[in-house]
Amino acid sequence: MPESVISIRNLKISFGALHVLRDVDLDLYRGENLVVLGRSGTGKSVLIKIIIGLLRPDAGTVNVLGQSVTDLDSRDLDALRLKIGFSFQNSALYDSMTVRENLEFPLVRNERNLSRADINKRIEEALDDVGLLQAIDQVPSQLSGGQRKRIGIARTLILNPEIMLYDEPTAGLDPITSIEINNLINEVRERHHTSSIVITHDLTCAKTTGDRVAMLLDGRFERVGTFEDVFDSDDERVQAFYNYNFIDQP
C-alpha cells in the first residue's frame, strides 16, 4: 500500500447555504503528482486552503505528513507549512525586489543561521533548477509570464519542501510556455523527490503532469484514477468538461 503524505476523509465545508465540499476523500501518495481537476468555482482552491490550515472544515479529517492539521496550534502549523511549498497562480513575487532578493527573503526569514555563502549557493542552485540563473539580478517586471512562474517555483523550492502545491500553473500562458511549465513540474518531482498536488482546469496540464487525476464534481471527487480512466466515462459532466477543453476552445 503506498504511503499517504496527505490523507483527507469525510471532508465537508459550506459557506452559508453553499455546500462547497461534501464528504471528500482523497490521498496524495509519496512521490506522485496528483492533479485536482475541475471547473472554476468548484472548490479546488478551498481544498488547498484547508490542507495548509488557512480554512477550517465543518467536518472531516486532514492529515499532512502524519499530523492532523485541524488539531495543530499556530506554532506547529507554521512548522508544518515549512514542509509544504505553494506555487501561486500569479507567482506572488515582490515587484520591488530583484530575483535574488525574492529568493533570499524566505531563507533569511526561516533559516537564520545560514552564512552569506550558503545563502548565495542555495539561491543559485534554485535558479539553475528552473533554468533562470541568468535572471538573478533582474526585477519581476523585466521577466515574461513564464519566467515569473519559474522564479516563483524556484522560490518555493528553496526551503526544500516535501510537498508541492501548484495553483493553476499554466494559467495565462501561451501553449509553448505551458508545455515548459508542465515539464518543469515533472522535473521538480524527479530532482527533489517531492509529492505534488496540481490544481488546474487545463486538460493538457493534467495529462502531462498527473500520475493520477481527481475530478471534482458537485463537491465530491467522483472520478479518481489515470487521465484515461477518469475520462473513460459516460458521465455527461465529465464529457462536457473534456469537450469544452479540447473541442470548443479556439
Regions found by a protein language model. Name each.
Residues 164-167:
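Catalytic Walker B motif of ABC-type/P-loop ATPase nucleotide-binding domains
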Residues 158-162:
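A short, proline-enriched helix->beta-strand linker immediately N-terminal to the Walker B motif
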Residues 218-219:
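Conserved ABC ATPase "signature" C-loop
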Residues 139-143, 147:
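Conserved ABC ATPase signature
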Residues 68, 116-134:
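Conserved ABC ATPase "signature" region
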Residues 52:
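Helix-to-loop junction immediately C-terminal to a conserved catalytic motif
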Residues 175-177:
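Helix N-cap at the start of a conserved alpha-helix in ABC-type nucleotide-binding domains
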